Every structure is written in C-alpha cells, then in structure tokens.
Amino acid sequence: MNERDRRIIDVIRALRDGEVVTYGDIAEDAGYPKMSRLVGRILATTDEELPWWRVVNSVGRLVPGHEREQAAQLRSEGVKVSDGRVRNARYGRFS
C-alpha cells in the first residue's frame, strides 16, 4: 500500500462514534484535498476494517446500495438519518 492510501485509511480509522464526514473532508485531512473520489475507491476496495458508514457525500447522502445498513450503523451511534440523508450527527460536518 502506498503512503497516500495509508494516510487516507488512517484518517478514516480515527473517526469517532457519531462522527460523520464527507469524502472530501477525509481527502483534505489526509493532505490530498482534490482526491475525494480516491477516498470512495479506497473504501470500496480495501480489505481493512474501517468505519465506512461514517463517510457520506457532500450533501449527507448515504452510500447507494448500502443505505439501510449505513443508516442502522449511524443510528446506533446517535446520528439522525431520514430520507437517505444524515440530518444531525454528534460530531463532524453534520453536527
């Protein structure tokens, strides 16, 4: 794994319960502000156990095809979800 991917994974791994951020937030925090699509690719392809459910698109939409599972995970952490979007998180962009 290259250094760029490792930095992105480290940022994702550090997300707290109830924290919801965007792909762009992760990319920026890892030092690659223009690489939000790479964050999605890493989440979709890595074998590492990561809290993928805490990452959403720029308007708070859940991951297509995984909405039910993602919403359940987020709700278990105290995040409000309705109509396929994060409405209120404990921490992060949508708090």
Which residues make up each language-model segment?
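Nucleic acid-binding interface residues in structured DNA/RNA-binding domains
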Residues: 1-95
